Amino acid sequence: MKHDRFFREHPVFTGEELGEYLASRGEMGARTQESLLAYHRRTGRVVQVRRGLYAVIPPGADAPTYPIDPFLIGAKLTPDAVLSHHTALEFHGRAHSVHTRITYSASRPPAALRFRSHAYQGARFPHALLRAGKAHACVVTAERAGMPLRV
């Protein structure tokens, strides 16, 4: 398929990222993005995590049971999401236990989300850091599945 490269490079992606990709290829018609997503959702190649957030299912895998990396989902829930709290310890391999709750910090976290076996809970950046413009102080950017994540 002609969009396989995008799907390989973006195991979890937003509708905005797909729109930018389609525009860069000159394929941005009025309903191109919607019809492309609808087609791939029908065929089981893409699953919707929440409105505007999607995960790719490899060819031949069973869409309802294929494990999707929860860290990638947590890092894409908002444009400024940072994996935080116990989730950051898990990501770095320093946690003593594994949780099914993924915690991320953001300036305006959306409502809690449950997707498959994980619960995603947002926490607001501390107001003092936001006022000082240092919401991402001490945040490192790590790579996972070829995608940058803020932890």
Give, region by region, the residue ranges found by the protein language model.
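Leucine-rich, amphipathic alpha-helical/linker segments
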Residues: 87-88
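Phosphate-handling catalytic interfaces
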Residues: 91-151
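Residues that recognize and position ribonucleotide moieties
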Residues: 11, 81, 147-151
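Short beta-edge/loop segments at beta->alpha junctions of small alpha/beta modules
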Residues: 1-80, 115-118
